[in-house]
Amino acid sequence: MQLWQKQLNLFFIAMGFFTRIPMPKWIEVDADKLNKASRYFGLVGLLVGAISAAVYSLMLYWVSPSVAIVFAMITSVLVTGGFHEDGLADTADGLGGGWTVEAKLNIMKDSRLGSYGALALVLALLLKWQLLTELALFDPSSVSLALIVGHCLSRVVAASFIFSEEYVSDTDTSKSKPLAQQQGINELSILLASGVLALLLVGLVPALVLITGLVIVRYGFIRLFRSQIGGYTGDTLGAAQQGSELSCYLLLLILGVSW
């Protein structure tokens, strides 16, 4: 298999793991490839953002921007299966309801939704809709840009934890086993390159502001997760992705960035 075929294979594995989009039948999957596929987390975000932006732009022909945003949000959840929202809810339940590290990790593994998780989900979705609606008031086209950039950069931030933090859950039973293995500089370079692609859409100054803001957000999440559970789990990566996505929308709104 040639180099480009190997990379395409890894991208489709990442797409199949992080979304509900089916992989082509010719894709070769094994444990090693599954671990290396995290390098394309950002590109998968670009894809999810582009699909959501396309639905938003299409719906603008028939409904108001605020309603079109709801359809875009529904689309992203359908495409990903609520993968990251589930992580946010589990993280909120675990950190909010557990008194010890072991208790927090056990609560995160519980698929049932608790009060902390429900509150986190509702507040995150409301804030996401409100931020995007405010962007639409400034310029309806800016929402499409925000969706693409936000979905990509937030996944770059979340996946970057794999390269610097310790995985603290049981790798044998975890549903996020591909996120548990630390990767090398090649994987990190490809991950960051996908973030650069998104930043090219916003211009130099907004890009620098986004980088600075997301570095601060990442640091905050790292401090939180280290103090609470000593590292990260797949669920906390979902929480970091959702928090970073909301941060992107907030920063783009403050900057007033549009196409």
UniProtKB/Swiss-Prot annotation:
Q: What species does this protein belong to?
A: Shewanella halifaxensis (strain HAW-EB4)
Does the entry feature the keyword Magnesium, yes or no?
A: yes
From the record, give the transmembrane residue ranges.
9-29, 43-63, 64-84, 118-138, 143-163, 196-216
Say if the entry is tagged with keyword Transmembrane. yes
Q: Name one GO cellular component term.
A: plasma membrane
Q: What class of enzyme is it?
A: transferase
Tell me the protein family, please. Belongs to the CobS family.
Q: Which cofactors must be present for this protein to function?
A: Mg(2+)
The pathway is:
Cofactor biosynthesis; adenosylcobalamin biosynthesis; adenosylcobalamin from cob(II)yrinate a,c-diamide: step 7/7
Give the membrane topology, semicolon-separated if more than one: Multi-pass membrane protein
Official protein name in the record: Adenosylcobinamide-GDP ribazoletransferase
